[in-house]
């Protein structure tokens, strides 16, 4: 279902106009991006997502809806409704753990995603990193950040190993263990890109866990494991800068202390690695 109304509505207006029998249940806690709530009617639940990023164009939110509309139920919740500023998606019943699944299970899930038809829009990190720099708190801009940004822009993004649809925010809170298997939620950063970029961006605990995931994926995708790992390492500086910039971006938008703590920790990691 899609509305033709071009003016963003409040949550209460959305409920009264399109979901009159539903009431807010609990806020969605998965992920860091916010902007979600769960609405319920008797035992039936729906996730209502708001376009929460004032600096992102409406087209980005529409892409999120299109990605969910295109993906199979074996990967993601179904898109149920869209109107400018809001969408409703299927609520997935299951267990959410902060820890990632084991390497084989996660590799199978990501490989299944990467076998799907492409979304139709490319993920471009260079302009995104530049946006984070320009939109962050000016007091947080450092010569170190600018040097790293310019070096990445000079080098250019790695040539893709394989192009596929990517999720780009894979961590434990965005994976639901349903009765039918693992599913991914929170697809707002989805787009087409290198499979090694996806693997580089997974929120792993350490390099050992990262290598296990890469090896499991290589075996499933029939890719040389050493070649895949080299490609992942090429993307690594981009991913670390992406995370640091995103934390800074969200800090400027929200003022929430969790983001500044995460940004500081990510900058420390970058400085330690030179």
From Swiss-Prot:
Enzyme Commission code(s) on record: 2.7.1.89
Presence of the UniProt keyword Glycoprotein in the record:
no
Q: Which UniProt keywords apply?
A: ATP-binding, Kinase, Nucleotide-binding, Transferase
Q: Which Gene3D superfamilies match?
A: 3.90.1200.10
Q: Which GO terms describe its biological process?
A: thiamine diphosphate biosynthetic process; thiamine metabolic process
Record's catalysed reaction(s): thiamine + ATP = thiamine phosphate + ADP + H(+)
| Record GO terms (molecular function) | ATP binding; thiamine kinase activity
Under the heading NCBIfam families, the entry gives:
PRK10271.1, ycfN_thiK
Q: Which family does it belong to?
A: Belongs to the thiamine kinase family.
Check the record and name the HAMAP family matching this protein: Thiamine_kinase
Q: What does this protein do?
A: Catalyzes the ATP-dependent phosphorylation of thiamine to thiamine phosphate. Is involved in thiamine salvage.
Can you say what this protein is called? Thiamine kinase
């Amino acid at each position: 279902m899609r509305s033709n109304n071009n003016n963003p509505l409040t949550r209460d207006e959305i409920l009264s106009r399109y979901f009159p029998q539903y009431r807010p249940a609990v806020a969605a806690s998965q992920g860091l991006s916010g902007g979600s709530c769960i609405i319920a009617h008797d035992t039936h639940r729906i996730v209502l997502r708001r376009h929460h990023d004032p600096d992102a164009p409406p087209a980005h939110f529409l892409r999120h809806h299109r990605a969910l509309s295109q993906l199979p139920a074996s990967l993601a919740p179904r898109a149920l409704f869209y109107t400018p500023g809001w969408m409703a998606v299927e609520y997935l019943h299951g267990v959410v753990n902060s820890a990632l699944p084991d390497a084989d299970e996660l590799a199978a899930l990501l490989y299944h995603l990467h076998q799907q038809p492409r979304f139709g829009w490319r993920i471009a990190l260079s302009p995104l990193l530049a946006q984070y720099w320009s939109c962050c708190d000016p007091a947080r801009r450092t010569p170190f950040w600018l040097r790293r940004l310019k070096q990445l822009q000079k080098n250019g993004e790695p040539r893709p190993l394989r192009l596929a649809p990517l999720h780009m925010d894979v961590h434990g809170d965005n994976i639901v263990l349903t009765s039918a298997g693992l599913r991914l939620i929170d697809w707002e950063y989805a787009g087409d890109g290198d499979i090694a970029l996806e693997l580089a961006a997974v929120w792993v605990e350490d390099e050992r866990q990262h290598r296990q995931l890469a090896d499991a994926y290589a075996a499933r995708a029939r890719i040389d494991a050493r070649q895949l790992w080299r490609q992942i390492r090429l993307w690594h500086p981009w991913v670390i800068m992406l995370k640091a910039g995103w934390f800074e971006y969200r800090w400027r938008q929200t003022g929430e202390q969790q983001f500044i703590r995460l940004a500081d920790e990510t900058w420390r990691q970058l400085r330690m690695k030179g």
